[in-house]
Amino acid sequence: MLTRIISGLVLLPLLFFVIINGGISIYLGALICSLIGLYEFFRVFEGSGYKPLKTTIYAMTVIMYTAMTYSGMSYSHIVISVTYLIFAVGAVYIMNRRIRVEDLMITIMGYIYIPVFLSHINLLSMDQTIYIWLVFIFAWGSDTCAYFTGMFFGKHKLIPEISPKKTIEGAIGGVVGTVLLTLVFARYFQEPNPIYFIPLAMIGSTVSQIGDLFASAIKREFGIKDYGNLIPGHGGILDRFDSILFTAPLTYYGITFITYIQNL
């Protein structure tokens, strides 16, 4: 626990610096986390004999983030173009029998699950930087509230076959705590309609917990405890960012919808 706390105290100032500084800091931070996350993700499958197109995905991830930041192309065009290139390269490998179809599917899954999902933080940084904080409130705020609620009040297991320690009471506490934290955020940044953020916070906490359980299900399926050991006390990048991968897209599209409603 002490190691976990120390790691958190080291990483939090770094996170604050990246978000507050914005621009190139967020671009590099998201890109580096995506590349490390991909490495951890593919390593799990390689241990069971799969052969994902790692080099191709690493290159395409760099291209995607760079195009997002500097090209002026629309996000959807970039993602579709990169996905097409991955399929094209994979098809050539399959025809030459260098990989199997399932290897390509794992490659595509890794690409969507990690760099595409996480890249929504970059999208937020372009014109809605303050809302990046919600990505982390929905993920880490929810996790913290769920942890302490479960510790003191947890009696009924949530999904014990995937995560034995999580409880229904903890999950509910995570949602309630996230709503309260989000209202504090809305008040601090003087949002004109904070009530709009309540359903977003509830969905955000729920999605965060689903992201955590999804990552846990993969680990349990392949018989591993952590995705890596890069962060002492926490595991790898994916162990720390499993919920972030799910809350980043939700936050972006949720804020886009709220902005649309407010402008009607």
Descriptions of predicted regions:
Residues 222-243:
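Interfacial loop-to-transmembrane junctions
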Residues 1-167, 171-202:
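Membrane-embedded alpha-helical bundles of polytopic integral membrane proteins
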Residues 218-219, 224, 244-250, 254:
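C-terminal transmembrane helix pair
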Residues 12, 178-179, 240, 247, ...:
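Hydrophobic transmembrane alpha-helices of multi-pass small-molecule transporters
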Residues 253-264:
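Juxtamembrane boundary at the C-terminal end of a transmembrane helix
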Residues 181, 185, 250-255:
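Hydrophobic alpha-helical transmembrane segments that constitute the membrane-spanning cores
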